[in-house]
Amino acid sequence: MEDQVILVDENDTEIGVEGKMIAHRSGSLHRAISIFIFDSADRLLLQKRAASKYHSAGLWSNTCCSHPRPREECARAARRRLREEMGIACELDVKFGFVYRAVLTNHLIENEFDHVFFGRHDGDPVPNPDEAEDWKWVDLAWLRADLNERPHAYSFWLEACIDRVIACREEDRTRVA
């Protein structure tokens, strides 16, 4: 049976479920999760999406992204997928949500209400090769500059939210100081 995604309205109110590929072909708005893991040096862990992924293959992206299953809370889905994709278990905090829409190169449509989580982990990930073919720790300022120079090397959703991610990290540092 095909994986299902949770269909939502613009307020993130659940309105149904649909097959994942059907939702990406039709452009149905559905719930998603994006995880950003930082180390103690405040570097962000990026993954390079596996060549076998059905969209955005071979592109650099945030640490982990996926969809919650029907009746699964976003926080639980985020912890599950972070373990499955990158072999990392850590505390995650939801930071914000945003909606983005993009027509991808293979004519699939990303139309997601994305819940963004931050976590902290020191050490190397153990990526699932079906999900990620490479990884690296990067400084956020370097990433912002590289996204400006080479946007084609990154997932659309990373570009869509990176400025808000950077602003949240700045707010977090200000609160701690």
From Swiss-Prot:
Family (UniProt): Belongs to the IPP isomerase type 1 family.
Pathway: Isoprenoid biosynthesis; dimethylallyl diphosphate biosynthesis; dimethylallyl diphosphate from isopentenyl diphosphate: step 1/1
Keyword ATP-binding attributed: no
Function: Catalyzes the 1,3-allylic rearrangement of the homoallylic substrate isopentenyl (IPP) to its highly electrophilic allylic isomer, dimethylallyl diphosphate (DMAPP).
Entry keyword annotation includes rRNA-binding: no
NCBIfam families membership: IPP_isom_1, PRK03759.1
Binding positions for Mn(2+) per the UniProt entry: H24, H30, H67, E110, E112
Subcellular location(s) of the protein: Cytoplasm
Comment on bound cofactor: Binds 1 Mg(2+) ion per subunit. The magnesium ion binds only when substrate is bound.
Keyword tags: Cytoplasm, Isomerase, Isoprene biosynthesis, Magnesium, Manganese, Metal-binding
Positions bound to Mg(2+): C65, E85
Superkingdom of origin: Bacteria
EC number: 5.3.3.2
List of catalytic residues: C65, E112
Record-linked CDD domains: NUDIX_IPP_Isomerase (cd02885)
One CC-aspect GO term: cytoplasm
Name used for this protein in its record: Isopentenyl-diphosphate Delta-isomerase 1
Domain Nudix hydrolase: 28-160
Pfam family, one: NUDIX
Needed co-factor(s): Mg(2+); Mn(2+)
GO function terms (MF aspect): isopentenyl-diphosphate delta-isomerase activity; metal ion binding
